[in-house]
Amino acid sequence: MRRILLSLLIAAFIGISLPQTSFAAVRTIELIEKPHQLIDGKFLNDDLATLLAPEGRIGSLVFTPAPATTRWVIDGSFLDEIAAMADGYELADETDGQGVEIAAAFLEQLKIATAGAEVTSIAFGNPDLILAKQLAPSELLFYFSYGAERVSFHIGRAVAIDKSFSNEKRSKVSGLLRKNYTINRQAISKLSTVVTAPELQLFRARLAILLSPSINGDLSERFAQSAVDGVAAERAKLRINPGKYALTSETVDVPLTLVNGFDSAVTVNLIFRASNIKVLVNDMRQITLAPNSRTQFAVPFTVVAAGATSVNAALTNSKGQWLGPSSQLALTMTLIDSRVAWFTTGAAVLLFIGAAAQTYRRVRKGRR
């Protein structure tokens, strides 16, 4: 009997001594959603506006008071989508979205709801971590860091990175779409070596969505095509305008226009590849183009022989990697021998003098 009483007293003492918070369960709220915005920026539909409303499935998580022990796990890509809505957005059917005010209210309430709570971010776009490690392990590190940067930006404070979070589902993206993802990622990675503009960093990160387990089948095809179109648009921002030129002397300065459509300055190399040896031209190194600019350069070409030729001009980074497709310069060379030129010029001068003399004689004769 004494042993039973002693055990009860010890149990009661332990229960009184331990802090009550140790028994409080930590609630985890995940703000992770399948993508509603295509890579090119348009929204598939307006379903997200309904989800973000205070009574919606996602909105209720933020607008309903949460205990202080709540842990928030957030995808920065999802918050970027909501921010895009708050700025005004367009749907894929080219109509305007109706969730601008709802999105803005959600972001403001999120700052209040997460104040003082534990917040962790996952890889931007919630990609399949196993697949991402297989296809691009270094890019996965970028997805983690960029995801934390975006979550921190939206809630106004630093957050931790959760590299262990992963969906139970696996991505079912096909082998062809995996290859397309790799090609698109490599194209944007090359551009990123010379372009530091935020819009390109965002586009680079959004490619992670292609590896998300939440998009499969027809939806993955649609996102893949959106990525292809988006990559083409990004590469076209940095280009050389094509043109046709007639060269009539041995050395000619050909005016080429280089376009930089990004919000940051870039430094590139301009290289040339002629289809034959009828013309000679040297590459131009370390050319700096101002943000959102069209810059014209006079490039000296040396004509070796008459005829027609084409020259492909391309922009590269310091490693010699092409930053986009080349532009074709169509050249027509008509060499005029210097002796023929002097003879033609002399004949023209003599004809002019003869015509002037004849006019003078007619004037004098008329006065008489």
Spans of features found by a protein language model:
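N-terminal membrane-targeting/anchoring modules of bacterial envelope and secretion proteins
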Residues: 1-253, 258-259, 268-291, 295-298, ...
